[in-house]
Amino acid sequence: MKAVILIPARLDSSRLDRKMLADLEGEPLIVRTWRQALKSRLAEKVVVATDSREIAAVLDACGAEVVMTSPTASCGTERIAEAARHIEGDVFVNLQGDEPLISPENIDLALEPFFSENPPDCSTLVLPLRPDDHVQIEDPHQVKVVMDAKGFALYFSRSAIPFQRNMRPTTIVYRHIGLYAFSADVLQKFASLPPSMLEEAESLEQLRLLENGFRIQCVTTLVDNPGVNTVEDLEQVRRIIRSSLPG
């Protein structure tokens, strides 16, 4: 079982332009994400998929493996599917390029189901929230997920799900962490499908899988790694990195 981490990276971003090259204490954001991915115990290879020559040049200088992709990809998963056609692998991880603090243990958690007797079509991570954490539950930028009794996703939404009409103290709300692992064939099938109705309504690419009958296994983690989507996120990550430096 050969696992490969693919990191989609584009230069333009709707909320924070050129964030992949943003400086994080002397190193570009995308380079820090790549270095964290290299620490995975289960993945044998890490590759960055980009349509930007500028990003590719920065990564080449660090010794990273890069695959150039088309600028027409509608989402990160389509970008890595294009790259995966040129790479030998049984399982491919889609690790967002804006995750410079990603825990290698979280990457391995997403991969572990594929080393079992009954590997899923796709796996992803979820983080339990307190029922009274209304800020995260109601934030449309924090995606929520509901699962069946076996831990497979029923639905992902930017809305608060489950709706809290009769919320019990024992009810757990789960936030989705956008790290995915796909079997090689499911990844290519995803890319061959057109964007789905619910995917476009919620702007959540994983709904394309659910609408087409694929099953997504959700693995619970207690480790939350802040990504970078806004200027405020960028400053928060800089503070975290700064506080971890010696001296």
From Swiss-Prot:
Coiled coil: which residue ranges? Answer: none
One Pfam family in the UniProt entry = CTP_transf_3
| Family note | Belongs to the KdsB family.
Query: Which InterPro entries does the record match to this protein?
Result: Cytidylyl_trans (IPR003329), KdsB (IPR004528), Nucleotide-diphossugar_trans (IPR029044)
Per UniProt, which keywords does this protein have?
Answer: Cytoplasm, Lipopolysaccharide biosynthesis, Nucleotidyltransferase, Transferase
Q: What is its main location?
A: cytoplasm
What are the cysteine partners in each disulfide bond? Answer: none
Q: Tell where it localizes.
A: Cytoplasm
Q: What is its EC number?
A: 2.7.7.38
Query: Which molecular-function annotations from GO does this UniProt entry contain?
Result: 3-deoxy-manno-octulosonate cytidylyltransferase activity
What catalytic activity is recorded?
A: 3-deoxy-alpha-D-manno-oct-2-ulosonate + CTP = CMP-3-deoxy-beta-D-manno-octulosonate + diphosphate
Q: What is this protein called?
A: 3-deoxy-manno-octulosonate cytidylyltransferase
Source organism's superkingdom? Bacteria
- Cellular component, GO, one term: cytosol
The annotated pathway is: Nucleotide-sugar biosynthesis; CMP-3-deoxy-D-manno-octulosonate biosynthesis; CMP-3-deoxy-D-manno-octulosonate from 3-deoxy-D-manno-octulosonate and CTP: step 1/1; Bacterial outer membrane biogenesis; lipopolysaccharide biosynthesis
The record's Gene Ontology biological-process terms are: CMP-keto-3-deoxy-D-manno-octulosonic acid biosynthetic process; lipopolysaccharide biosynthetic process
State the top-level EC class.
Answer: transferase
> What biological function has been recorded for the protein in this entry?
Activates KDO (a required 8-carbon sugar) for incorporation into bacterial lipopolysaccharide in Gram-negative bacteria.
Please give the start and end residues of each transmembrane region.
Answer: none
